């Protein structure tokens, strides 16, 4: 079919329909959302859960949500900016941090539903493929589906780091190893050791060592926060191991106590009826006294 110029006449503008607001803003892929949200018709009121992963400049957001007419309902959430509590104070947007955030989300969710002792997940990090299976006589494994949003789902994307963390944490999420670091598209083989290195932050540690040898100034600029927090390349693996253990030990979100704000009054409060009557009586008495003094003088 050849090129056809769109004639923007009166009929075009009269029949024009704007796209959904979030499509206009470039925030939602409705083609993908439709397939992630619509539940099987034989499951009736059962929600279809999604694991939402969003990577920002300074944070990684992981949420478990399901769709309702009123809007998406968030069941549980975990954020990378909460990782300093577990000992990870630097590199909060790298692959290792994404894994930790996914792990925190999974353990927090299972703890909320009382399933954390039933589904421990994979405690020792190997980087290899692992799938959670339901245990007979126990509640079924919590199943959800990855929602990567508008992120480009290339091999090694941090979104899949969060996915791996959630799966190792005990959630059942359909996936394959094709998008994990360590998968070779030419040989069609997956190297679990390469994936484990990324989970343990060894790719960052190797780059730190390289910069320390090659360019000291670039190292100080690139890893200023690591230097400030005294994090060396040799400490990285142990730091993440301790973080994984700490997350499993206490994944519960602690609510901050509400600050009591003392209300300030900037205008005078209204007087009650009794106060108004009393004020009038005082003014009358004052006026009468003034009249009496004037008469005496």
Curated annotation (Swiss-Prot):
GO biological process, one term: ribosomal large subunit assembly
Subunit structure: Component of the large ribosomal subunit (LSU). Part of the 5S RNP complex, which is a LSU subcomplex composed of the 5S RNA, RPL5 and RPL11. Component of a hexameric 5S RNP precursor complex, composed of 5S RNA, RRS1, RPF2/BXDC1, RPL5, RPL11 and HEATR3; this complex acts as a precursor for ribosome assembly. Interacts with NVL in an ATP-dependent manner. Interacts with RRP1B. Interacts with IPO5, IPO7 and KPNB1; these interactions may be involved in RPL5 nuclear import for the assembly of ribosomal subunits. Interacts with RRP1B.
Entries under HAMAP family matching the protein: Ribosomal_uL18_A
Positions of crosslink type Glycyl lysine isopeptide (Lys-Gly) (interchain with G-Cter in SUMO1): 220
Coiled-coil segments on the chain, per record: none
Name of the protein in its database record: Large ribosomal subunit protein uL18
SUPFAM superfamilies: Translational machinery components (SSF53137)
Family matches, as InterPro entries: Rbsml_uL18_euk (IPR005485), Ribosomal_uL18_C_euk (IPR025607)
Matches recorded under PANTHER family: LARGE RIBOSOMAL SUBUNIT PROTEIN UL18, RIBOSOMAL PROTEIN L5-RELATED
Ranges where the record places region Disordered: 253-297
UniProt source species: Macaca fascicularis
Modified-residue entries (N6-acetyllysine), positions: 5, 48, 220
Segments of skewed composition (Basic residues): 258-268
Disulphide bridges, residue numbers: none
């Amino acid at each position: 079919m050849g090129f056809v110029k769109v004639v923007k006449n009166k009929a075009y503008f009269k029949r024009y329909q704007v796209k959904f607001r979030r499509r206009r803003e470039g925030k939602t892929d409705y083609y993908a959302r439709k397939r992630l949200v619509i539940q099987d018709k034989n499951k009736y009121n059962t929600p279809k859960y999604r694991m939402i992963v969003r990577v920002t400049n300074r944070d990684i957001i992981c949420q478990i949500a399901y769709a309702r007419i009123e809007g998406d309902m968030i069941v549980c959430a975990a954020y990378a900016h909460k990782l300093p509590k577990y000992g990870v104070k630097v590199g909060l947007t790298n692959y290792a941090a994404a894994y930790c955030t996914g792990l925190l989300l999974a353990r927090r969710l299972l703890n909320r539903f009382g399933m954390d002792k039933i589904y421990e997940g994979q405690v020792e990090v190997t980087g290899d493929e692992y799938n959670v299976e339901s245990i007979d006589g126990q509640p079924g494994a919590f199943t959800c589906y990855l929602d990567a949003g508008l992120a480009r789902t290339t091999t090694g994307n941090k979104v899949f780091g969060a996915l791996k963390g959630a799966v190792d944490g005990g959630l059942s999420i359909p996936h394959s190893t094709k998008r994990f670091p360590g998968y070779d598209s030419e040989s069609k083989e997956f190297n679990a050791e390469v994936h484990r290195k990324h989970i343990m932050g060894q790719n960052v540690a190797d780059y730190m060592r390289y910069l320390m040898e090659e360019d000291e100034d670039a190292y100080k600029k690139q890893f200023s926060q690591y230097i400030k927090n005294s994090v060396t390349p040799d400490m990285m693996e142990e730091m993440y191991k301790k973080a994984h253990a700490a997350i499993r030990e206490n994944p519960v979100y602690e609510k901050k106590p509400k600050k009591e704000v003392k209300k300030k009054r900037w205008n005078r409060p209204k007087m009650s009826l009794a106060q108004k009557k009393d004020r009038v009586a005082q003014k009358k008495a004052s006026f009468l006294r003034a009249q009496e003094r004037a008469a005496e003088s």
